[in-house]
């Protein structure tokens, strides 16, 4: 099946014009989307809980209200709080104040797909899912570009929800990169699988396993870090630009032969079965139940794992290596103040 890609020239922003947009939450995506929409000429207000971010958003020049107050004023409400908090914010503040015929948007379908949020039938429900972190989304926009987004419709009582979703995606800058249609279920399943099996879970385990293999064999941790982690960005950039073909073309013949010969020794049938098991847990709701139970228990296991990883040799070596290259930190100029503060504290 061929998926149509929409660009700026294909999308009319009129369905979103003259509508007040309330972005609920000012984390990475909320920050990027609200700022990009405002620059694109849309009427944006923020809905937040009192706290540091409330004051930070005011300094950024937005009108700031509670989530309930922002929802009551808005025609479009975009849920940008963390997945694990959305159901509570929805139940207490958004649902009681959402007008019939309003557009309710999400950047990830978790709460809709797993039944944690169930909007009334008279509410338009859409997804606009940027395919990248918020700071990159903001950076690309400021530099004149954008990142691709997916859009989809869950409920459409007014008949124009898809057009509103595409206009929103254009407003955050995705029209110059490409906008693709999806469904809530497809976006949620593929996003969770990609994160867990490949982009984050699979990749971090692969990198650390390679690092440990070299160190255990007596090689320098710093050089092992360069070989298994630091160079990863350059290899991924080649794949990003031209797929595996460009990566193989730009690497040596020695590298290419070794990659094709020995790659299957690393990603074995057992690894592939593990991926299928991860996918099944996402599809049948097992992972969602585990994650919500973990959150409701106070994140004890997650905090334990975070502590273990931070104290490990790989992370400690990475800090030493990155300290030798201070220019690396200059690349991250578009995180929210809260993100930067949290990351600095973690370091």
Swiss-Prot record:
Its cofactor is Mg(2+). The active site is at residue 108. Binds 2 magnesium ions per subunit. Involved in the biosynthesis of branched-chain amino acids (BCAA). Catalyzes an alkyl-migration followed by a ketol-acid reduction of (S)-2-acetolactate (S2AL) to yield (R)-2,3-dihydroxy-isovalerate. In the isomerase reaction, S2AL is rearranged via a Mg-dependent methyl migration to produce 3-hydroxy-3-methyl-2-ketobutyrate (HMKB). In the reductase reaction, this 2-ketoacid undergoes a metal-dependent reduction by NADPH to yield (R)-2,3-dihydroxy-isovalerate. GO terms for molecular function: ketol-acid reductoisomerase activity; magnesium ion binding; NADP binding. PROSITE patterns: KARI_C, KARI_N. The keyword Kinase does not apply. InterPro entries: 6-PGluconate_DH-like_C_sf, KARI, KARI_C, KARI_N, KARI_prok, NAD(P)-bd_dom_sf. Belongs to the ketol-acid reductoisomerase family. GO terms for biological process: isoleucine biosynthetic process; L-valine biosynthetic process. It comes from the Bacteria. Pathway: Amino-acid biosynthesis; L-isoleucine biosynthesis; L-isoleucine from 2-oxobutanoate: step 2/4; Amino-acid biosynthesis; L-valine biosynthesis; L-valine from pyruvate: step 2/4. Its EC number is 1.1.1.86. This is Ketol-acid reductoisomerase (NADP(+)). The gene is ilvC. Pfam families: KARI_C (PF01450), KARI_N (PF07991). Mg(2+) 2 binds at residues 191, 227, 231.
